[in-house]
């Protein structure tokens, strides 16, 4: 026996096993924070794939775009946006900003418009303790599919049965007019979807006006270009303000570093670029916090002036207090 007897018993070779099974699932995507005395909750509607960036950002050079994307450790052959729905509890009102893609237009149209990872807002809101019946105002930044198609279900029933819907008169008229089913292929489903969703609330529509409050503490600000009636919303409580910027800028690198680049889904790309540059400049100068619908989850942060454009500075996520 000798030295061999002193060795510990070694079992025969066995396949390696993990100490726990792989979960292969994600937790609900919601985040809560404070804006003064208001309580804000961001809930994800999922990811929105746009495909290769070159046809989407129309007046940019491929070389410059590739350099920016590589510098941000992003793929150069695909563009994927987040969709960050915001709910603000003012103590008197529970306001949802934009509805996500929803299911109103059926599985095929929803997948064609938003890809396979969208329409998750309601599940994430419920996980955060918020039900559709509690919402008393849906403030729509504009009437595109990923912002208003969640107002009704596939049968046309109201998803938010106790809510009014705030939208600009310009967007309401434009996106419910069959005469605008021309130009890019997306125009026909966008118009059909807006008609179905906004039409269901025709007796509960509130027309937003530039500079006017939709409820105390929440002010609509015109930001035209992406659509004719696109608005952002300034949310103020105490000495704190966060601006929900809707689709002012879709990409946190390309349209922030290069705000004058154009986006193919803009109704008026040049006006959109001017509006974006002007507002980002104001946010940077005034150190205004913003919540962007399409920036990386949860979309909360600031912009800082950098060269001919700006840089996106995300707010660190606080997981211990509401702030």
Task: Enumerate the predicted regions with their spans.
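Active-site metal-binding motif and surrounding structural segment of the metallo-beta-lactamase
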Residues: 77-78, 82-85, 112-166
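Cap/insert and terminal regions of metallo-dependent hydrolase folds
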Residues: 114-115, 119, 123, 234, ...
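Conserved beta-strand hairpin/beta-sheet module of binuclear metal-dependent hydrolase folds
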Residues: 29-128, 232-248
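Divalent metal-coordination and catalytic microenvironments
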Residues: 37, 88, 98, 135, ...
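Histidine-centered catalytic micro-motifs
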Residues: 138-148, 224-230, 291-297
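Metallo-beta-lactamase
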Residues: 116-130, 134, 161-222, 271-278, ...
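Active-site metal-binding loops of divalent metal-dependent hydrolases
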Residues: 45-46, 99-102, 143, 170-171, ...
């Amino acid at each position: 026996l000798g030295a061999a007897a002193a060795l510990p018993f070694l079992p025969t070779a066995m396949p390696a096993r993990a100490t726990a099974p792989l979960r292969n699932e994600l937790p609900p995507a919601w985040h809560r924070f404070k804006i003064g005395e208001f309580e804000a909750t961001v809930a994800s509607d999922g990811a929105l794939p746009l495909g290769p960036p070159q046809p989407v950002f129309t007046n940019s050079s491929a070389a410059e775009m590739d350099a920016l994307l590589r510098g941000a450790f992003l793929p150069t052959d695909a563009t994927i946006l987040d969709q960050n729905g915001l709910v603000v509890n003012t103590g008197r009102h529970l306001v949802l900003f934009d509805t996500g893609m929803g299911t109103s237009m059926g599985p095929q149209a929803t997948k064609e418009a938003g890809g396979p990872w969208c329409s998750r807002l309601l599940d994430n809101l419920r996980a955060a303790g918020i039900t559709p019946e509690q919402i008393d105002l849906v403030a729509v930044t504009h009437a595109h599919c990923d912002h208003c198609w969640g107002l009704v279900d596939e049968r046309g029933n109201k998803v938010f049965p106790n809510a009014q819907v705030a939208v600009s008169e310009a967007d309401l008229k434009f996106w419910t007019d069959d005469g605008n089913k021309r130009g890019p292929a997306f125009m026909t489903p966008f118009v059909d979807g807006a008609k179905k969703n906004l039409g269901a609330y025709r007796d509960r529509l509130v027309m937003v006006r530039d500079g006017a409050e939709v409820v105390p503490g929440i002010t609509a600000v015109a930001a035209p270009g992406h659509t004719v009636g696109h608005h952002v919303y300034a949310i103020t409580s105490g000495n704190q303000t966060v601006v929900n910027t809707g689709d002012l800028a879709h990409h946190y690198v390309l349209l922030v570093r290069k705000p004058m680049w154009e986006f193919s889904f803009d109704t008026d790309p040049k006006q959109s670029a001017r509006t974006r540059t002007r507002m980002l400049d104001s946010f940077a100068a005034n150190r205004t916090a913003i919540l962007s619908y399409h920036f990386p989850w949860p979309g909360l942060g600031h912009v800082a002036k950098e060269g001919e454009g700006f840089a996106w500075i995300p707010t660190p996520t606080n997981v211990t207090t509401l702030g």
